[in-house]
Amino acid sequence: MKSKLVLLVGFALLLSMTAFAQEYPKIEVPVGFSFVNVHPNQAVITSFNVFGGGGGFVYNFTPIFGIKADFMGYTQGSGVKLTENGQFLGNVSGNLFTYMFGPQIKKHSGKFQPFGEALFGAAHTNLDANICKLEGGCASGSGNNNGFAMEYGLGLDIPITKTIQFRPVEVDYLYTHFGSNHIAGASASQNNFKYVAGVNFTFGGK
């Protein structure tokens, strides 16, 4: 029994020494295009897309573990039409910004380098709306709101050179929680889908 335990401990130490002996970048800087399919949980707005992009910063502490900062911005400039039973009620347009931080796990070797992340932070939105009553008469307004943001997901990087990687896909579940002061009775929570594609720059290989 003791010999098996010693063997297991030795094998674990060998794996950890092998992992730490691998060369990996100390810093990553991803930038790219992104869109979010927003689900505001409203009867008149089931979902809509906002488009934008941004970047981030990753500091890798080990060959597989790093801490990531992620900053993204989105807009819906053309506006979302509001209808009920075929009747036009108005339109809504606005922006969304997210600022999140958290751990990233990534394989830093081979032709394909998958990664996963879990990020937490804040979101900011501003909204412009024109609302019309069914019996006639319209009103316009605007507002902004700050809330909690969280996302977790997976992605893939493909090395092109030692310092440039192509990121064809990153998909995330993005949760946001705002107050319901924009629309009376609105849900404070939104469950959204996020997609990112772009380039990842790596620096400081160990």
Model-derived segments and spans:
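Surface-exposed strand-loop-strand hairpins of Gram-negative outer-membrane beta-barrel proteins
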Residues: F35-G54, N145-N146
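Cleavable N-terminal export/targeting peptides
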Residues: M1-Y24, G204-K206
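Short sequence motifs at beta-strands and strand-loop junctions characteristic
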Residues: E23, S47-V50, S93-F97, S142-A149, ...
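Gram-negative (and chloroplast) outer-membrane scaffold detector with strong preference
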Residues: E28, G56-G137, G147-F148, I158-I160, ...
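Subset of outer-membrane beta-barrel
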Residues: S47-N49, D157-F166, V171-N181, A186-N192
